Amino acid sequence: MKRIIFMGRSECGKTSLTQAMRGEKVRYKKTQYINHFDVIIDTPGEYAENCNLARALALYAYESDVVGFLLSATEPYSLYAPNCTSAANREVIGIVTKIDREDANPERAENWLRLAGCKKVFHVSSKTGEGISDILEYLKEEGDVLPWEKEKEEKTTKNNKKTTKTS
């Protein structure tokens, strides 16, 4: 499975998307540092908003196969400069988040991501789950099983063996 790093400003939905993709309950949690979750790298928004911290994002991008630029559908402006993806030596995809919100304008956010240079753009809602499977399918490679699905299967198999032994 391709490894992805999520980048975007604070509160654009990076951690919520990480939780939704992993099948966890989505709950607000402020990301304080760069977190690795199997094939997902979740980053604090301050790293994208501060040019001194942004260097760390550039370095961490080397640990991924794909860079995901996240932009909330409720944003009044874009964090990403036009054609900024040309500086990346990784594939950069756009992810429009919070499409379920009443004040959402996903078309505007998608246009901004395309101006930044994202060729592929996904629309997602971590709250409703809409679009999550599309990103997972995109990241999957032939024969892949999601790491957290594999863990669940192993736990189920282990529990079944315990039940069989006690019977």
Model feature map: region roles:
Residues 69-123, 138:
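Conserved C-terminal guanine-recognition region of P-loop GTPase G domains, centered on the G4
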Residues 12, 48, 130:
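Short alpha-helical
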Residues 1-43:
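Conserved G1/Walker A P-loop phosphate-binding module
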Residues 30-32, 59, 84-85, 113:
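Short secondary-structure boundary/capping segments
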Residues 37-38, 65-66, 91-93:
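Loop/turn-to-beta-strand initiation segments
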